């Protein structure tokens, strides 16, 4: 039986209100507040009409990190649209879910330089300052992209810009054209590192201009962080996952 990751009525507004102050400040900006109100109205209407919306915790990527805590940003597009998959963290699924193809390619790339991750739940990355943010935070069952163009992009663009404004050094991993379009939100003089490649989907991972396969982004990220006196990310995920599992339960 899949994990019940369905969004409950009124949960989206409650979770937004419970976000850390630094993120709530972004949501309170006038243009962002209007966009979020539009999203919220649409989501609640669809739930009232009987639609199944995922995930149960749309803002989970923000729950554990303030902007100043973020060291790496990985952008996804919208949540997985099957039952029991989406967790509120881009690319991540529960450990008992079959590994999605894009995540499998991510693990393959990590395994070039580090031990291959054994868990599909990427919570350990979040504990180390990796923001796993989709640009649309909700989706309807079996309908990819169903909540795109509803206002989420305005909300998540503002969140990305807030992270980029923070002066602590960060790496932005932009995979695919959708993520790369967000590079404009990262000022060139901000002192951050931007690495771009194709999306890890099997449809594009080996294609030019910059194949995801062989991109070396995980190694490059750690080298850059270490040059700035920061700890490398344990991409294998083992050091934090086991002891923190309960905290990240859906």
UniProtKB/Swiss-Prot annotation:
Region (Disordered): 228-250
GO cellular component: cytoplasm
Record localization: Cytoplasm
Active site: 78 (proton acceptor)
EC number: 3.2.2.27
Molecular function GO terms recorded: uracil DNA N-glycosylase activity
PANTHER family (alphabetical): URACIL-DNA GLYCOSYLASE
Protein family (similarity comment): Belongs to the uracil-DNA glycosylase (UDG) superfamily. UNG family.
Protein name from the UniProt record: Uracil-DNA glycosylase
Native organism: Bordetella bronchiseptica (strain ATCC BAA-588 / NCTC 13252 / RB50)
């Amino acid at each position: 039986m899949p994990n019940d990751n369905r969004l409950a009525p009124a949960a989206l507004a409650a979770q937004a209100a419970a976000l850390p102050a630094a993120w709530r400040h972004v949501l309170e900006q006038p243009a962002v507040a209007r966009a979020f109100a539009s999203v919220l109205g649409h989501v609640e209407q669809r739930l009232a009409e009987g639609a199944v919306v995922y995930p149960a915790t749309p803002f989970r990527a923000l729950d554990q990190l303030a902007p100043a805590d973020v060291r790496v940003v990985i952008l996804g597009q919208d949540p997985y649209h099957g039952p029991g998959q989406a967790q509120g963290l881009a690319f991540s699924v529960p450990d008992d879910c079959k590994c999605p193809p894009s995540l499998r390619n991510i693990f393959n790339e990590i395994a070039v330089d580090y031990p291959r991750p054994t868990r599909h739940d990427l919570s350990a990355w979040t504990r180390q300052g990796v923001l796993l943010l989709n640009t649309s935070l909700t989706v309807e069952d079996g309908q990819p992209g169903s909540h795109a163009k509803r206002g989420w992009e305005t909300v998540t663009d503002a969140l990305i810009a807030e992270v980029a404004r923070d002066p602590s050094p960060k790496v932005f991993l932009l995979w695919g054209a959708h993520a790369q379009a967000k590079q404009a939100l990262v000022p060139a003089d901000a002192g951050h590192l931007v690495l771009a490649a194709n999306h890890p989907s099997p449809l594009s991972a080996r294609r030019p201009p910059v194949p995801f396969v062989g991109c070396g982004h995980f190694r490059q990220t750690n080298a850059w962080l270490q040059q700035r006196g920061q700890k490398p990310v344990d991409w294998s995920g083992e050091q934090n996952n086991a002891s923190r599992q309960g905290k990240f339960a859906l």
